[in-house]
Amino acid sequence: MAVGKNKRISKGKKGGKKKASDPFAKKDWYDIKAPTMFTVRNVGKTLVTRTQGTKIASEALKGRVFEVSLADLQKNEDDAFRKMRLRVEDVQGRNCLTNFWGMDFTTDKLRSLVRKWQTLIEAHVDVKTTDGYTLRVFCISFTKKRQGQIKRTCYAQSAQIRQIRKKMMEIITREATSCDLKELVAKFIPESIGKDIEKSCQGIYPLQNTFIRKVKVLKAPKFDITKLMEVHGDYSEEVGAKIERPAAAAPAVEEAATA
């Protein structure tokens, strides 16, 4: 008879089955706060693993980027095609304080603008704001028929396109370099730069659907808590707020101290 292990007989595993732990039990929810330039300040919530040893929860949250529709931030459905990127700069209590980190268009809006019989003109330029942010701003525009035009097409000549592109870059540079990031975002929301471009290019060729299509943050200045607090105006006031004590309670406290 052959002596050896019988492989068919399965042994019971050591320790038995491990208890399935809930991964959410070790996590916490944090509120995402948008800057004061937007109407809605509470953007949503984000999950993070609780502080354990050297792994600190607030450090894991810093640098997170959230993409939010401008329609949700401004309570205006007409702005639904614009996406805002917000980056967590600091964590205070259970609040993640964010700042502007870029802007983009939804794909469906961009596709709906491109049509036949017109010229698409694009331009991009790198600008630096007064508070030290380096941004790359992309602009898009389309030609339109002149008043009373019967001809089906409205194509611009190469020389006209170059002139329009130059004008675009001049206006974007002028608007961006004369203000800080907060003021610049306030210009992006109502599309005031696009309207300025259409107005100034009227003499070269009539334009329509002129938008700041995309904004990238290339370089940000060194983190400054005071500047972040300016963007999130209401938080600095809450810290160390003076509590007024009732007049009757004050003498009672003094008597207790002397006794």
From Swiss-Prot:
GO MF terms held by the record: structural constituent of ribosome
Keyword Glycosyltransferase: no
GO terms, biological process: translation
Basic residues composition bias: residue spans: 1-18
Stretches for region Disordered: 1-22
InterPro entries attached to this UniProt entry: Ribosomal_eS1 (IPR001593), Ribosomal_eS1_CS (IPR018281), Ribosomal_eS1_euk (IPR027500)
Cellular location(s): Cytoplasm
Superkingdom assignment: Eukaryota
A GO-annotated cellular component: cytosolic small ribosomal subunit
PROSITE patterns found in the cross-reference section: RIBOSOMAL_S3AE
Any Pfam family matching the protein: Ribosomal_S3Ae
Keyword Protein transport belongs to the record: no
Alphabetically ordered keywords of this record: Cytoplasm, Ribonucleoprotein, Ribosomal protein
Summary of subunit composition and partner proteins: Component of the small ribosomal subunit. Mature ribosomes consist of a small (40S) and a large (60S) subunit. The 40S subunit contains about 33 different proteins and 1 molecule of RNA (18S). The 60S subunit contains about 49 different proteins and 3 molecules of RNA (25S, 5.8S and 5S).
The family this protein is said to belong to: Belongs to the eukaryotic ribosomal protein eS1 family.
Protein name: Small ribosomal subunit protein eS1
Organism, as annotated: Chlamydomonas reinhardtii (Chlamydomonas smithii)
